[in-house]
Amino acid sequence: MAKKVVGFIKLQIPAGGANPAPPVGPALGQKGVNIMEFCKQFNAKTQSQAGTIIPVVITVFSDKSFTFITKTPPAAVLLIKEAGLQKGSGEPNKNKVGTVSKEQVRKIAELKMPDLNAVDVEGAMQMVMGTARSMGIVVED
């Protein structure tokens, strides 16, 4: 018989940096998941991407076991890395803080394609360009 799903937990954790401290510990503790076991598995799976924030969806079952799926890093994190910035603009409509090229946007869109709800790369690029616009990053042709 299949295990019964008790719930899903969505977190954004730095790759290779999961530890029992908040936010990971309390979120997993509420569902009764073995926190250290998750931390070991997550860190082992993401150690090659160290420093990047990785979204993860943890599926918790009735017997307290779990599985997890890692997603691609958020578009905002990838844009900041491509533009060489510390953070986005506080007033994106007034202050532009950086620029990225269409090629850089295409690269990010292709990387994000599995997680985006887009039919083709052009649609994914539009989503990434919208994120850039909301962060005060100018997209150049």
UniProtKB/Swiss-Prot annotation:
Query: Which SUPFAM superfamilies does the annotation name?
Result: Ribosomal L11/L12e N-terminal domain, Ribosomal protein L11, C-terminal domain
Q: Name one GO cellular component term.
A: cytosolic large ribosomal subunit
Task: Output the PTM entry.
Answer: One or more lysine residues are methylated.
Molecular function terms from GO: large ribosomal subunit rRNA binding; structural constituent of ribosome
Q: Which InterPro entries match?
A: Ribosomal_uL11 (IPR000911), Ribosomal_uL11_bac-typ (IPR006519), Ribosomal_uL11_C (IPR020783), Ribosomal_uL11_C_sf (IPR036769), Ribosomal_uL11_N (IPR020784), Ribosomal_uL11_N_sf (IPR036796)
* SMART domains assigned: RL11
* Keyword hit for Amino-acid biosynthesis: no
Recite the UniProt keywords alphabetically.
Answer: Methylation, Ribonucleoprotein, Ribosomal protein, RNA-binding, rRNA-binding
> Its Gene Ontology biological processes?
translation
Similarity comment = Belongs to the universal ribosomal protein uL11 family.
Query: Assembly and interactions?
Result: Part of the ribosomal stalk of the 50S ribosomal subunit. Interacts with L10 and the large rRNA to form the base of the stalk. L10 forms an elongated spine to which L12 dimers bind in a sequential fashion forming a multimeric L10(L12)X complex.
Its function?
Forms part of the ribosomal stalk which helps the ribosome interact with GTP-bound translation factors.
Query: What's the name of the protein?
Result: Large ribosomal subunit protein uL11
Originating organism: Prosthecochloris aestuarii (strain DSM 271 / SK 413)
Gene (UniProt): rplK
